[in-house]
Amino acid sequence: MSDLLNTLGIAPINSGGFGGDWVGSGPEVEVATPIDGSRIASVKTVTEDEYEQIVGQAAHAFNAWRNVPAPQRGEVVRQLGDRLRAAKRDLGALVTLEVGKIAAEGEGEVQEMIDICDFACGLSRQLYGLTMPSERVDHRMYEQWHPLGVVGVVSAFNFPVAVWSWNAALGAVCGNSTVWKPASRTPLTAIAVTRLAEEVCRANNVDPAVFSLTIGGGSTIGERLVQDRRVGLISVTGSCEVGHHVAGVVGQRLGRTILELGGNNAIVVTAHANLDVALPAILFGAIGTAGQRCTSTRRIICHRSVRSELVNRLKRAYAGVRIGDPRQPETLMGPLATLDAVENLMQAVARVKSEGGEVLCGGDRLEDEAHPGGHYVTPCLAAATNDLAIVQEETFGPILYIIDYGSADATLAQSVDEVEEAVTLHNAVPQGLSSAIFTEHLREAEYFVSACGSDCGIANVNIGTSGAEIGGAFGGEKETGGGRESGTDAWRAYMRRQTNTINRSTELPLAQGIKFGD
């Protein structure tokens, strides 16, 4: 472990703030791995005075960065992507160590950063406005998009670096600087990535405060960032409760937000589904990252005619899930991130039973020698109805609810009409992030992605709820928050729109033909 940390510039005790210089004289936070509870390193958090210094430096960096031509900004971001690519294996290993993701997912998160850097570089030559015809003679009207300023990014523990990159890479090519507040329980990957960004900036004679960092408590540093009028846009990944608070605070100062909050994602499995395709998608969605993704599959809305076969196949698959040290290549599910997460899962399992559902398998703690530290559980499969209170909530862990729809003796033709019932159940939760349907029938697929279908920001056909690509806009509706990260036009969220009218005549005609004065 020490070789890995040394390679990435992680010391036994690290400064938790960066705005061109590394600072941190606040309380020290010890970071332990959920793999076995052992210490990784410590971080000195930033004080409120240091926060002021960092945001001031980020604002100063913006003043110069916004004047750099966008394609040149894109080149800097491209180089950051190359630097991340070279460090992919080491950074992925640190994600695994800090979060508990299996090795493939740790490296996959780093690949997301690489992908968005490549994507943002391409967009740096496409930050275009439109020219509109003017109703006035010898006038031209057009729009421009200008950099917004300082962008604040509050990321969550489950994707400790990828979500930052979605905002920072696009924000940077748009001419903004970024102040990043990562989750306090996963700060080391943030420090490692910021060090790489610093190297790239210095190599290009760019003020490295373009990529600033503030590690501290949510109630102190996080709250300062949300309230700060110098920060024009706040992107927050977190719970619905946190999102409501942030939206209220930022709304009071008429700032902008991108909110990626809770998900209660469902897969509809129809009578026409190919279960050979559906099964691995369900498994990856439900137990990947130990069920700690915003897009994790929480519900299966299954046609009664295929329920028995699907449940039996899921039980066999769950029994074969290899749970343990995520650094080992054979492991499919690692630990939950915290002991609180374990307790929340245990409470959810108990509530399923008390509210009238049935636990079909799993939902137990693993506390033997092969699973040290108390963070390991078996994934839970439960039968439930959609209206159970626990089903309406998001439990951030590997619990999957099987919910029935349709008639067991319906003909295949009749079952197509029953997809409306499935969609009604699907949409009857407060959240609206990601969704999917598995079917070989065109009518069912088209209905699901129509205006009458899924009410989520993401709706897939024959692919699961997890595993979004950079080219698609990511975000949701309802309690999931609103706003989008990544995607073809997400850059507009990081810029301000300006309309320009140019008069090349020697007169001053007014719009709408208004006559004013003599």
Where do the model's predicted regions map?
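Conserved C-terminal structural/oligomerization subdomain of aldehyde/semialdehyde dehydrogenase
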Residues: D36-S42, N205-V206, V231, V268, ...
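Glycine-rich loop-to-alpha-helix module at the N-terminal edge of alpha/beta enzyme cores
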Residues: S38-L127
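Generic secondary-structure signature for well-ordered alpha-helical cores
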Residues: H60-A64, D82-R89, G100, G122, ...
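ALDH superfamily catalytic-core signature
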Residues: L196-E199, E241-N386, S407-V416, V461, ...
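A short acidic/small-residue loop/turn micro-motif
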Residues: V23-G24, T45-D49, A273, E367
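Hydrophobic face of amphipathic alpha-helices that form TPR/SEL1-like repeat modules
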Residues: M1-D36
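Rossmann-like NAD(P) dinucleotide-binding subdomain of oxidoreductase/dehydrogenase enzymes
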Residues: G129-V277, A413-V416
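Residue-level signal for inorganic ion chemistry
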Residues: G37, R73, V95, C117, ...
